[in-house]
């Protein structure tokens, strides 16, 4: 019996359709949408004074998020947002959703976003709440970076 189990000829590889069906059973449709069609993926020039960059990670699972905001210096409104995430579907979905959420917000509004808002919108299970926490930490880090660039003598 064990010899049969050890024989690779008896295993069928998972195809894209198998993976998609499994994901649909485990994830809410909003997570699948943001994972398969992520919004605002990319990078901005972090050396620009009106661009704030936040890079955060979770050592326990290996997820890393880089989130960047471009702020209108006169109005304080976030005009552009980009992200790159190395991580699971929930981390990518949380990042993508965050970019949609903060575009058009003031810095004061964006810094108040809590991970629970993201988790609720995406219907994340408790085991994936850390992904929404990373998105919250990333926007806060990006805002801090932007403010530090604008006034380096003040700690935020």
Curated annotation (Swiss-Prot):
Cofactor note: Binds 1 [2Fe-2S] cluster per subunit.
Predominant cellular place of this UniProt entry's protein: mitochondrion
Chloroplast as UniProt keyword: no
Any single Pfam family the record assigns to this protein: NifU_N
Alphabetic keyword roster: 2Fe-2S, Iron, Iron-sulfur, Metal-binding, Mitochondrion, Transit peptide
GO cellular component: cytoplasm; mitochondrial matrix
Subcellular locations according to the entry: Mitochondrion matrix
One annotated GO molecular function: 2 iron, 2 sulfur cluster binding
GO biological process: intracellular iron ion homeostasis; iron-sulfur cluster assembly; tRNA wobble uridine modification
Pathway listed: Cofactor biosynthesis; iron-sulfur cluster biosynthesis
Segments traversing the membrane: none
Record InterPro entries: ISCU (IPR011339), NIF_FeS_clus_asmbl_NifU_N (IPR002871)
UniProt note: phenotype after gene disruption: Cells deleted for both ISU1 and ISU2 have decreased activity of several respiratory enzymes that contain Fe-S clusters. As a result, cells grow poorly on carbon sources requiring respiration and also accumulate abnormally high levels of iron in their mitochondria. Knockdown of ISU1 in ISU2 knockout cells reduces cell growth, decreases cytosolic tRNA thiolation, and increases association between SSQ1 and GRX5.
Cofactors that this protein relies on: [2Fe-2S] cluster
Range annotated as the organelle transit peptide: 1-26
Biological role stated in the UniProt entry: Scaffold protein for the de novo synthesis of iron-sulfur (Fe-S) clusters within mitochondria, which is required for maturation of both mitochondrial and cytoplasmic [2Fe-2S] and [4Fe-4S] proteins. First, a [2Fe-2S] cluster is transiently assembled on the scaffold proteins ISU1 and ISU2. In a second step, the cluster is released from ISU1/ISU2, transferred to glutaredoxin GRX5, followed by the formation of mitochondrial [2Fe-2S] proteins, the synthesis of [4Fe-4S] clusters and their target-specific insertion into the recipient apoproteins.
Subunit structure: Component of the core Fe-S cluster (ISC) assembly machinery. Interacts with frataxin. Interacts with the mitochondrial co-chaperones JAC1 and SSQ1. Interacts with NFS1. Interacts with ferredoxin YAH1; interacts with the reduced form.
Note: Present with 3420 molecules/cell in log phase SD medium.
Family membership noted in the UniProt record: Belongs to the NifU family.
Protein name (Swiss-Prot/TrEMBL): Iron sulfur cluster assembly protein 2, mitochondrial
């Amino acid at each position: 019996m064990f010899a049969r189990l050890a024989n690779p000829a008896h295993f069928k590889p998972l195809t894209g359709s198998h993976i998609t069906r499994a994901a649909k059973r485990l994830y809410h449709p909003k997570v699948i949408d943001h994972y398969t069609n992520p919004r605002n993926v990319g990078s901005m020039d972090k050396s620009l004074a009106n661009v704030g960059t936040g890079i955060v990670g979770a050592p326990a699972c290996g997820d890393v998020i880089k989130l960047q905001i471009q702020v209108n210096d006169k109005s304080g409104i976030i005009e552009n947002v980009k992200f790159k995430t190395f991580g699971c579907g929930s981390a990518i979905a949380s990042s993508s959703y965050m970019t949609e959420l903060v575009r058009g917000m003031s810095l004061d509004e964006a810094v108040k976003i809590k991970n629970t808002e993201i988790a609720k919108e995406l219907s994340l299970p408790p085991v994936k709440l850390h992904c929404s926490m990373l998105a919250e930490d990333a926007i806060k880090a990006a805002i801090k970076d932007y403010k530090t660039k604008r006034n380096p003598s003040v700690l935020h």
